[in-house]
């Protein structure tokens, strides 16, 4: 590694002479460029040393192609917001864990009811449970990608529900700031929805339990990746009746006139009518068509359609792309002195352009994160302007490929 670094520095210091300019300024700028080159070479070497040690869930045990290896280091670009809105209490929770598994990113929205502690626990624990279950499933033979992820998500939701039920029965104390500690010792009326997405090199995995929702924008079309679990959904209504439960229409369809969803984490007082089984969907990613993914609580979806939400996010991301292109296009904005200095400090050995490109990529990635956050905020403002009565939580994930 040291020899490579020395060769880069030696090669760059002996090549290329440009027009006359301030030698002090040139020397200082040259030193900065050499430091950047060293950093880029060192980072590349570290990536090469660790890439062979990475454990992947995708691939089924075969050798990864070069394209798949490139996708492993895809950077997560996302933004989110969560606001109380017109509610007295904030009961939503959001989770974003880029790189929680090698080459995979985790995102989740959890909409609590009764209190916040189940949603908070989901936000803190769900990704950890998925990591455990994914590790246990990594050695499963004879299962395709969809079946493996379906099993991982079903077991993860069951474990999360068991933890919530244990908390409601007093086996685990509620959080110190939880208002349930001032109520009954058994807080079995508390629960949460859960919609989670795992973004991998080749697939998007979405698991949903409740009425939070995931929507994919592909080729300009809004594609829902989850279906709300409402008590009056025909298959859910049939399941509840078969279990001996009733759906009463009181301010909308509710299980026994109380809960406005038919599946949730927690809510032990309504089991077995309200279950925690997620519906899992595994979508193969399509480069050039997949644009972004939206996860949000029903505080958004009650007042904003899938299509309108996708149009808002697309406008934000396109606006950001135009700003980025305007910044990166022209050397016409540089003075003659700046242009000549840049040309002098970028000999044709390739290393300086890599360093400059690395810095530019970091700026572009930061701009894309900012655009996703702005899109999430704009959706939240739209929901509030349309008089949503619930907490609003939104996660926006950019699906356009950009590798590290």
Curated annotation (Swiss-Prot):
Q: Where does Mn(2+) 2 bind?
A: 111, 298, 390
Q: Enumerate composition-biased segments (Polar residues).
A: 330-343
| Enzyme Commission number(s) of this protein | 3.1.3.16
Do you know which InterPro entries this protein is assigned to? PP2C, PP2C_BS, PPM-type-like_dom_sf, PPM-type_phosphatase-like_dom
Composition skew (Basic and acidic residues), residue ranges: 42-52
Query: GO: which molecular function terms?
Result: metal ion binding; protein serine/threonine phosphatase activity
Q: How is the cofactor bound?
A: Binds 2 magnesium or manganese ions per subunit.
The residue range of the signal peptide is none
User: Cross-referenced CDD domains, in alphabetical order?
Assistant: PP2Cc
- Cofactor(s) listed: Mg(2+); Mn(2+)
- Ranges for domain PPM-type phosphatase come to 77-399
Q: Membrane-spanning regions, if any? A: none
Sorted alphabetically, the keyword list is: Abscisic acid signaling pathway, Hydrolase, Magnesium, Manganese, Metal-binding, Nucleus, Protein phosphatase
Q: Where in the cell is it found?
A: Nucleus
Instruction: Look at the named UniProt entry and state the broad enzyme category this protein falls under.
Output: hydrolase
Positions annotated to bind Mn(2+) 1 = 111-112
Question: What does the subunit section of this Swiss-Prot or TrEMBL entry state?
Answer: Interacts with PYL5 and SAPK2. Binding to PYL5 is dependent on the presence of abscisic acid (ABA). Interacts with PYL3, PYL5 and PYL9. Binding to PYL5 and PYL9 is dependent on the presence of ABA.
Q: Which PANTHER family has this protein been placed in?
A: PROTEIN PHOSPHATASE
This chain's function reads: Together with ABI5, PYL5 and SAPK2, is part of an abscisic acid (ABA) signaling unit that modulates seed germination and early seedling growth.
- The identity of this protein, by name, is Probable protein phosphatase 2C 30
Give the organism, scientific name.
Oryza sativa subsp. japonica (Rice)
Taxonomic lineage is: Eukaryota, Viridiplantae, Streptophyta, Embryophyta, Tracheophyta
């Amino acid at each position: 590694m040291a020899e490579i670094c020395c060769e880069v520095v030696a090669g760059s210091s002996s090549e290329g002479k440009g027009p006359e300019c301030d030698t002090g300024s040139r020397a200082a700028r040259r030193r900065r460029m050499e430091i950047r080159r060293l950093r880029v070479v060192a980072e590349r070497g570290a990536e090469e040393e660790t890439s062979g040690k990475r454990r992947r869930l995708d691939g089924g045990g075969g050798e990864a192609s070069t394209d798949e290896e490139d996708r492993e280091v895809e950077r997560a670009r996302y933004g989110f917001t969560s606001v109380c809105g017109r509610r007295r209490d904030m009961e939503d929770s959001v989770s974003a864990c880029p790189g929680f598994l090698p080459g995979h990113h985790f995102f989740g929205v959890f909409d609590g009811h009764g209190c916040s502690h189940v949603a908070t626990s989901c936000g803190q624990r769900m990704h950890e449970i998925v990591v455990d279950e994914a590790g246990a499933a990594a050695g499963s033979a004879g299962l395709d990608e969809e079946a493996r992820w379906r099993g991982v998500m079903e077991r993860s939701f069951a474990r999360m529900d068991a933890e919530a039920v244990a908390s409601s029965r007093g086996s685990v104390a509620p959080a110190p700031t939880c208002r349930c500690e001032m109520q009954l010792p058994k807080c079995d009326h508390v629960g949460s929805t859960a919609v989670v997405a795992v973004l991998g090199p080749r697939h998007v995995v979405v698991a949903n339990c409740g009425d939070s929702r995931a929507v994919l924008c592909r080729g300009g079309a809004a594609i829902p990746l989850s279906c709300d679990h409402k008590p009056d959904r025909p298959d859910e209504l049939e399941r509840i009746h078969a279990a001996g439960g009733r759906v009463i229409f009181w301010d909308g369809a509710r299980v026994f006139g109380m809960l406005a969803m038919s599946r949730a984490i927690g809510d032990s007082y309504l089991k077995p009518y309200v279950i925690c089984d997620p519906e899992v969907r595994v979508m193969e990613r399509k480069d050039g068509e997949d644009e972004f993914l939206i996860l949000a609580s029903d505080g958004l979806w009650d007042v904003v359609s899938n299509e309108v939400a996708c149009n808002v996010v697309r406008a934000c991301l396109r606006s950001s792309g135009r700003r980025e292109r305007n910044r990166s296009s022209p050397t016409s904005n540089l003075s003659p002195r700046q242009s000549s200095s840049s040309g002098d400090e970028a000999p044709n050995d390739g290393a300086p352009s890599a360093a400059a490109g690395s810095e530019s990529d970091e700026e572009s990635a930061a701009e894309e994160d900012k655009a996703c956050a702005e899109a999430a905020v704009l959706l939240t403002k739209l929901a509030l302007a349309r008089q949503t009565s619930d907490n609003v939580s939104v996660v926006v994930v950019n699906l356009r490929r950009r590798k590290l």
